[in-house]
Amino acid sequence: MSIIQFSHANGFPAKTYSVLFEQLKEHTISAINILGKNTNSNDINYHDLTDEILESASQFGEPVIGIGHSLGGVLTLLAAAKKPEIFQYIILLDPPLFSPYKRFLIKVLRAMKIEDLFSPSGKSKKRRDHFDSKSHAKSIFLANKLFKNFHPQALNDYVIHGLTAGKNDVKLTIPVAKEVAIFHKMLTSFSKNVYKVKGTLVYAASNPILWTSDLHWINRKFTGLQVIPFPSSHLFPLEYPESTAQNINRCLKNFNLRFK
């Protein structure tokens, strides 16, 4: 049994991943439900979010397995690079870990103030964040292609935990403004320590956010990362949590065989 420190994707509270966690119940799961919950949109940044993960992971007094999806994957990588003694291994689920070429493009787009035309932030800005009720929100989600392949329970969990009731309506628990701000704060440079981390990167093979050039760069620079595909799109931990858990357990088994 391992202790897992899990970090969620941008916009999806950790409790949305309950099906995945259930499949990993032989392990102890620690997860901050909403990273940056008490930070406003203007002040949120990757470094503070990384420190939140480190604070949570360090409470166990022994090295943990760091697992993160998307944003959570990048933050897990940064955390393991900053305090390697806290992590015995990391598993990154389709992190937006881009090559220098793509990061340069992002910097140019930011300088031109047109990042939203190409970044997920543009779509996030258009998201509806208030609904009449949770049932009303669910009906809208079901018609949204973002959720079309979601595991039914994952969608239910998102309706329960991704929405907060107000006086007369419900709203997204993670506000659109904060989700957009996190996309806008995506790092365009990394410290040299990130290249020393050991672990596995599982990338989405369908409609990939990681281009072939990104994967070539990752394979060349991150010599301690095993890179493997998953036959689905970016949200696969919420779409196919059982298969994702099987992949995670295989990664952990291989880690135990290789390093223990």
Spell out what each predicted region is.
Residues 5-9, 69, 203:
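The conserved beta1-alpha1 loop
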Residues 125-182:
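Conserved alpha/beta-hydrolase catalytic His-Asp/Glu region
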Residues 153, 162-220:
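Conserved serine/cysteine hydrolase catalytic core
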Residues 31-67, 103, 108-109, 246:
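Active-site loop/oxyanion-hole signature of alpha/beta-hydrolase fold enzymes
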Residues 90-130:
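Flexible "cap/lid" loop of the alpha/beta hydrolase fold
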Residues 1-39:
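Conserved HGGG/HGGXW glycine-rich cap/lid loop of the alpha/beta-hydrolase fold
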Residues 63-105:
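Conserved hydrolase catalytic core segment
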Residues 232-242:
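Catalytic histidine-centered segment of alpha/beta-hydrolase-like enzymes
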